[in-house]
Amino acid sequence: MDVTSSSGGGGDPRQIEETKPLLGGDVSAPEGTKMGAVPCRRALLLCNGMRYKLLQEGDIQVCVIRHPRTFLSKILTSKFLRRWEPHHLTLADNSLASATPTGYMENSVSYSAIEDVQLLSWENAPKYCLQLTIPGGTVLLQAANSYLRDQWFHSLQWKKKIYKYKKVLSNPSRWEVVLKEIRTLVDMALTSPLQDDSINQAPLEIVSKLLSENTNLTTQEHENIIVAIAPLLENNHPPPDLCEFFCKHCRERPRSMVVIEVFTPVVQRILKHNMDFGKCPRLRLFTQEYILALNELNAGMEVVKKFIQSMHGPTGHCPHPRVLPNLVAVCLAAIYSCYEEFINSRDNSPSLKEIRNGCQQPCDRKPTLPLRLLHPSPDLVSQEATLSEARLKSVVVASSEIHVEVERTSTAKPALTASAGNDSEPNLIDCLMVSPACSTMSIELGPQADRTLGCYVEILKLLSDYDDWRPSLASLLQPIPFPKEALAHEKFTKELKYVIQRFAEDPRQEVHSCLLSVRAGKDGWFQLYSPGGVACDDDGELFASMVHILMGSCYKTKKFLLSLAENKLGPCMLLALRGNQTMVEILCLMLEYNIIDNNDTQLQIISTLESTDVGKRMYEQLCDRQRELKELQRKGGPTRLTLPSKSTDADLARLLSSGSFGNLENLSLAFTNVTSACAEHLIKLPSLKQLNLWSTQFGDAGLRLLSEHLTMLQVLNLCETPVTDAGLLALSSMKSLCSLNMNSTKLSADTYEDLKAKLPNLKEVDVRYTEAW
């Protein structure tokens, strides 16, 4: 039977042969030829007319015509004896098969066996038919209408050619030929009338597999392939293996124009449309490496800043809601990668997940590696898999470089204990409190990690500058989503302080409320950057700003004041003593609302208020409303007094000169910055019986002065002070001493024996961690 073919009517495309390459110039140019500063772009030669969905299966009539070789076979294959069979055909990756393998379709038809696919158009031919030319015959497919016929035609063409390209590109020999085939494959996808996600993804997956199996390509070959597939990436996410290839190129050639011209629209699309980096972590890693590549350019952060501006847009409100969450996710992952090598390499360093799950047990093992990170591991996926394993380790890390311990608060809270099965979470900030002996510890990162950290912290700063992004950014950062190593890193907390300051300056409640903890029992940025917190480096200036904005909002309540009184009364008093108006107002409100029940604490607050002009004025206004407070002050000074941590000699002098302290019997200067110079003020307290100098810089000179004047002192705590035998020997004149703590001092055994002999009332002595122990 004479079977002819035609392009069909209606002007629609009926047959697609190999499309011509769309790159300008000779496609056979050698690989080494440079493409110019700007990668070439292809025009999208989209077919006019109908669009079709790629078929994967469907019902159709099938007829097979065998080529006649004898007179009898010619009679048997004539149109009068021809029969049609209904089949449900599946267009698999390798062949055309029937759901009921009988009759004509007893055996599947491989795409490699199909020589040609054409539309039938001859006189008296069956309507809506396709012709598949195979060795020894022809397969006719009859659809129900012309649209289905064309849909089957284009789908079969696509499946056949994709199968061919998979075969051709699976065994590359000459890379100039491979590059030409890739370009033709891309052009075929761009000009196809089929509309389906796999139309663009299939070529990308073929190229991705090709690159993963050939890792010895030159840089120029890398760039040529990237430029060739660039048109497909404008509307499609790259597959995971292709992301790995892009990451490698960003690391090895950060200054390549391909990074700017090709990767920029790809990353922009990822940030605008990605919904969950957890399902595609390599997209996040590619975005991370792309931004680092931008940072390596001559302009550095200026280029990154312009990129962030382009993502936000020129208006006051970013039109893409997914950009900010995706940028924050990339920043958090990059910052974590800076510390991840240290987290994974130290046996006694738990992951942040373990801390949040309450997996804490004391451990005395010494770390084997210094706190120094070189290059972060590029395989973020494997790192995340490692971190997901539960490792029940300690959160107490002791070494010459870092010492992290659980702080014992002055409110006598129960000890923090948790087991692996406990649902309660430990206080993260308490876990980060650095002991005074190690307060000068600094974490040093390697050069690459340091650049990465600086880049992404700077991005967080840029994000915080946009008013429309700030509420969401504050909400995302409210749970403190950083590893404890980062929070113990002075450089990180110092740089991040700008972001927290922006939150504190924002008048919107939805922003500055995120400074507080995400729920009760958890610490937030408010606690982290308050005096005594691990991130505080400004003596409470940021803390005062946060309190000011919170008090100016709906937090001017008794509950908020009670929280301050229970947790941050010391910092509030210290800042008020230094003239901070916000803190003076806070103390006045505490008195006015009867937040403080203890009379001694009330007297201490009053003395603090009267030590400054602004405090005295506000206190006088308060006294006009509450005369009973003034009456309380007339009864005399407090018997117990505790100075806030980080108080100085000047702070103590100012406080003691502001009122009467003749009845003061118990004074605690623990964890302050006082020195021996304060001794001249202490000796003016004739009734003083108990003095706590734990972890201060009080030395031998001050100790000698005290021993001459405070002969009635009964309890003295010198734990972790720099005193030596020269000063300790002077204590022999304090015959009333009944309790003496010399823990962690330079006490010698001989001096200890001498003091025991000369102090008959001495009953309690602590000489642990000394030579006399």
From Swiss-Prot:
Tissue expression remark: Isoform 1 is expressed in peripheral blood mononuclear cells and kidney. Lower expression in brain and liver. Expression is down-regulated in activated cells. Isoform 2 is expressed in lymphocyte precursors, however, expression shuts down during maturation and differentiation in thymus and fetal liver.
Function (record text): Plays a role in T-cell signaling pathway. Isoform 2 may play a role in T-helper 2 (Th2) signaling pathway and seems to represent the first proximal signaling protein that links T-cell receptor-mediated signal to the activation of c-Maf Th2 specific factor.
Source organism per UniProt: Homo sapiens
Lineage of origin: Eukaryota, Metazoa, Chordata, Craniata, Vertebrata
Region span, Disordered: 1-30
UniProt key word Cytoplasm: yes
Protein name: C-Maf-inducing protein
Domain PH: from-to ranges: 54-163
Chief place where the protein resides: nucleus
Record key words, sorted: Cytoplasm, Leucine-rich repeat, Nucleus, Phosphoprotein, Repeat
InterPro entries linked to this entry: CMIP (IPR052813), LRR_dom_sf (IPR032675), PH_CMIP (IPR056429)
Subunit structure: Interacts with FLNA.
Gene expressing this chain: CMIP
Residue pairs linked by disulfide bridges in the UniProt entry: none
GO CC list: cytosol; nucleoplasm
